[in-house]
Amino acid sequence: MNRRLLKRSFIWPLLLMLLAAATMIGLAVSRLPAPTSALQIRPARAGVALPDGFYVYQRLSQRGIHIKSITPLNDALVVQLDTASQRKLAETVLQDILPAGFVIQYYEPQHATAWGAKLDRERLKFG
């Protein structure tokens, strides 16, 4: 009987630790940034004006591409789209409709990479 009591006394703390670990892992995974489907349009050289956001919206909408938003950001336009497949389609459409002199590339928001940089900074404090 003494052995049974001893075994039971180890089970509950172990279960609580496993539950706490599972909760922490679940919270950490839920806080990971979601992959974005955004494109950035910027001039290839200085002095080239950005295309009008409404023009870009109209042309992409005519081709059946659903746009979440078009935002100017640091001398560029950021086009937020629904899915990665629409991002690829929008990239080819934009290359067709925009004149030469624009760079169209995948855009990842700053907050998505900021947590990695923050972890690196925190790691430096531990040693």
Curated annotation (Swiss-Prot):
Segments crossing the lipid bilayer: 9-29
Residue ranges annotated as Periplasmic topological domain: 30-127
Gene Ontology cellular-component annotations: plasma membrane
UniProt keyword terms in alphabetical order: Cell inner membrane, Cell membrane, Membrane, Transmembrane, Transmembrane helix
Membrane topology qualifier: Single-pass membrane protein
Keyword hit for Iron: no
Cytoplasmic topological domain: 1-8
Localization (cell): Cell inner membrane
GO MF annotation terms: protein kinase binding
The keyword RNA-binding belongs to this UniProt entry's keyword annotation: no
Subunit structure: Interacts with EnvZ.
UniProt function note: Modulates the activity of the EnvZ/OmpR two-component regulatory system, probably by directly modulating EnvZ enzymatic activity and increasing stability of phosphorylated OmpR.
HAMAP family (alphabetical): Modulator_MzrA
Family note: Belongs to the MzrA family.
NCBIfam families xref list: PRK10629.1
Protein name: Modulator protein MzrA
Organism of origin: Rahnella sp. (strain Y9602)
